[in-house]
Amino acid sequence: MTQSRRMLVLRAVVEDYIRSQEPVGSTSLTRDHDLGVSSATIRNDMAALEDEGYLIQPHTSAGRVPTEKGYRYFVDRLATVVPLSEAQRRGINSFLSGSVSLKDALQRSARLLSEITGQVAVVASPSLAKATLRHVEMVPVAMTTLLAVVITDTGRVAQHGLTIASMPAVDEINRLSNTVNEQCDGLSLSKSAETVRSIAASAGYESVRGVADALADAFESMALDERANELYMSGTSHLAHSRSLADLAPLFDALEEQVVLMKLMSNLSEETNASGVGVAIGSEMHTPGLLHASVVSSGYGRSGAAGEPAGNDPVGEPETESETESQTNDTEPIAFVGSIGPTHMDYAATMAAVRAVARYLTAFLSEGRTQD
């Protein structure tokens, strides 16, 4: 009973510190929380939690504040992600429903997430490696060169030069393009490469075998491209309100390292909990500039029938934990949404906002409104 009560005390300390950003003492815990024990007992529990590394006392006469270990315990035991209010959901739908392209939706999402959380928001566009083929066109541009224009399911347009020994007739190139579009629609780029090689080996395509092989090579090259096309960031001005000004310079440096940031948040979005979000705290990120920060990330992507948000409320919250797990497991992440803030951020609210925006973008992709 003593240990379980101590964990209740820890939870209360974390909640109060997140709210006030001031060291928390036993007197305020006794007054504000129904812990069922005296102030002296709570004081002993807090001392024990400090010995165990969950709390720290910044000054002898001050109360306690959570450590990374304390925040991690708190986050891992959040029973549920607090659902957004109906007004918040309506606001998200209203603001994002005006998006006319995926790029527009991603830019709007970054701005909105930053406004909701009061923190830095980062939204990545999908990489080619996670995309599926929607359409390809091949256009001769020189005696031995074609330009392959590849359009993916996320609306991304990629161009790739194809070098061949000799140029076939335009009609033969168009026939190959039509066959590739028929057989590769909806396939990943790596699967598309395999299919194109099979087409090249089949009867009737001898004259365009060199073109097909070059196109397959291009698909394979694109399939290895894990980089996000764009990284949209909003809300760096919120950092100016930080109480720890000494932490700002390394944090700004970390935000400038977009490759490191993308890798961190992409990995985190793939290591989500049952609520569909991942959280990294301080030194867990192994990035000096983020030592005093936390990151919340969630993937967005393709959704199957069971996971698609229904009706006119794509950010509508699931009613049960099993529904949340179903939606999470039924979505194949192809990019991420994230929020970066102080370690004393409101984790429950931030996790809810990140998840809601990720679910909206998943619905947006499912509707196919991705063309610029």
UniProtKB/Swiss-Prot annotation:
It comes from the Bacteria. SUPFAM superfamilies: GAF domain-like (SSF55781), Winged helix' DNA-binding domain (SSF46785). One of its GO terms (biological process) is negative regulation of DNA-templated transcription. Negative regulator of class I heat shock genes (grpE-dnaK-dnaJ and groELS operons). Prevents heat-shock induction of these operons. PANTHER family: HEAT-INDUCIBLE TRANSCRIPTION REPRESSOR HRCA. Keywords: Repressor, Stress response, Transcription, Transcription regulation. This is Heat-inducible transcription repressor HrcA. It comes from Bifidobacterium longum (strain DJO10A). The gene is hrcA. Residues 300-334 are annotated as: Disordered. The keyword Protein transport does not apply. GO terms for molecular function: DNA binding. InterPro entries: GAF-like_dom_sf (IPR029016), HrcA (IPR002571), HrcA_C (IPR021153), WH-like_DNA-bd_sf (IPR036388), WH_DNA-bd_sf (IPR036390), WHTH_transcript_rep_HrcA_IDD (IPR023120). Belongs to the HrcA family. The keyword Transcription applies. It holds the Pfam family HrcA.
